[in-house]
């Protein structure tokens, strides 16, 4: 952590704890005490006593703030945007990692000592130990030997024992006789000429700045160029899968920066040495510079500030970058080439991205949910899953800020102890008397959020918080033709092809064209026969992840049948969620419901169309006949067939006529099953 040297504070000489000399003390001790008092109360004490003053720096963009409230308010904008992008990335990926035991490797790593921790609670406790060690960073430095002391008492004792020994070793002399009043003091010497100092150094290009305002303005040029490079990278991607790959690459950006910087400093490889040599030469004129900071100053002074923004050019693809580290990281893509997945033939730019992608095929679960025990392959999918358990964010700081990402939460906690990556001081500041601090202002009125415990100082911040955290995802990008909203700009570009009819992606096997690269890749699996997605329960393979997820619903159901039987609607209500509103049938999948609805659509179209040719009139169905059986004592004595249904009285009369004996009418039995 860069140390900020501030103005030295003067120690008052006439304090309550000043050294009191008794009148009974001998002359030798009085002379030594007077020498020590004069030394510690003069300019020597003020010029040798230093303490550190910490400023708060944003971990995302490097902006400096004097108070904690200002940097927290500023970081809120970065964190809300990045959490929304992570959620959208997880939803766009469309992949669900398998439920398998973890590999045993610790999912969390301490950023201070690189120790692997198994659970988030242990990681937070481990981080607290580091924070307590570095909680007190104020030290006092001796101006003669540059030794540091944790308290002013130790500093004064060191000055008395080490640097005032010459005055103590002098032979004692008797007290001087009383002298007349001293003459008036000479006029003070003129102040020394003011020296221009540039205490702020840029970590990207080593440029020195005199004030924090100039430092922030200079840092903005690097961040603008970085945003432009990321925007150009997104423009080159064609589909959501490639966008997910870019986001995986962004997760390893810090590792790539460290590897690139180590490659620049290494001398054992000729290509790295040539790249470092080319980084110190100006691309517009033959002048060579000794350092990257001198080169940046030369380009800004001679060729304008615009030329210093993207000063590093790739010799193979003519792309420009703002720093030599990014140029070296980009050059590895030309040297090492791309990396292809052997399972699904997906191509990645980095080996780390390929390894992370292959974990999905192997079913590794490195991140476990502490609530339900489910395993996930990436931290993004784990964070998205944890939001299903609770609506509030996962990590809460003592200052009131909440985070859904543990890494951002740990970086934020370091700002409370001053370890936020402040710029390095390269020159000291002349001492000046400390100014009295103004009384603290009363806190502004806080507006609480009705959905979470957070509160805000203004209504605009409260509305922005509710819209970004608790509201639905915004669709800021609109289609100029139909006005449909999208979350990302690349989705608008893909949607415009539906209006123009453009199909730029063609299959080399059958010549069929598609509007997106993802649809072409999905279609090519039908030619190659590759089924990259396999069910771990039954071993069945699928060409698309959506088909695998639909298939897994059969295994997750409480009852599984070898053959789907015909069950009543009440039995299928909780197992088949797709319902036909025409005939009332239930289906397990939407595809089955759509195929079934085509039958009703075809039937309706046939009823609406006129007959093409007169069809032969079918013969009338035979009229139903009614059979009446008359029995007597269990024996059938008459069978009567009628074409029209008869009443019960008429049937009894027919039976009596058939028997021919009126006295036997009481013994007649009518078989009502045939009436």
Swiss-Prot record:
It holds the Pfam family zf-C2H2_4. Residues 171-194, 611-624 have a biased composition (Pro residues). The keyword DNA-binding applies. InterPro entries: Znf_C2H2_sf, Znf_C2H2_type. GO terms for cellular component: nucleus. SMART domains: ZnF_C2H2 (SM00355). Residues 225-234 have a biased composition (Basic and acidic residues). Residues 269-281, 418-427 have a biased composition (Polar residues). Residues 235-261 have a biased composition (Acidic residues). Keywords: DNA-binding, Metal-binding, Nucleus, Repeat, Transcription, Transcription regulation, Zinc, Zinc-finger. May be involved in transcriptional regulation. This is Zinc finger protein 526. It comes from Mus musculus (Mouse).
